Amino acid sequence: MPKASEIKKFAAIEHNGKVFLVKDIKKLTPSGRAGASLYRMRLYDVATGSKTDESFKADEMITLADFRRHPVMFSYIDGEEYVFMDSEDYTPYNFNKDSIVEELLFITEDTQGLQVLTVDDLPVAIELPATVDMVISETDPSIKGASASARTKPAIMSTGLSVQVPEYIASGEKIKINTAEQKFMSRADSK
């Protein structure tokens, strides 16, 4: 069993007799000398989809739930349901739009490296790759010779995601975005 300080985002844990998915972790450090670090976790109940916040001491032991990862591709939208197809055995996994709204900012028909996390064969989350390539749909005009400056401007992707990009980047260009930090990394390889 790992300690609370070793738990990572998207881990499936057992707590109070239920299985939860860890969606966010914040480390809280008290200002006293004797204060131990606390880890505040945003947990989503796998069965009901409800969310709760729990705090754990850094050395508190946490039980991991048994979960599996399946490589998937985005397939289609059916009303409020987003359907992802297993890349190996073509099993469909349905997600309600509200449960994956943050992940949808990075998902297009061409997104590679997506994985579905399942607990007891039930889909509980979409795991994004570390980086995604996306095409800029809207940004201010590029400025020639601006590659020497570090100034940025907002750029909006087709999914609605907004990231800061260097001034020399133009609309229609494909860029690489870090999914964890929602930041521009570089121009994407044009293949």
UniProtKB/Swiss-Prot annotation:
Show the CDD domains listed in the entry.
Answer: S1_EF-P_repeat_2 (cd05794)
Q: State a single Pfam family of this protein.
A: EFP
Alphabetized GO MF terms: translation elongation factor activity
SMART domains in the record: EFP (SM01185), Elong-fact-P_C (SM00841)
Q: Name its GO BP terms in alphabetical order.
A: peptide biosynthetic process
Query: What does the entry list under GO cellular component?
Result: cytoplasm
Question: What's this protein's family per the entry?
Answer: Belongs to the elongation factor P family.
Its protein name is Elongation factor P-like protein
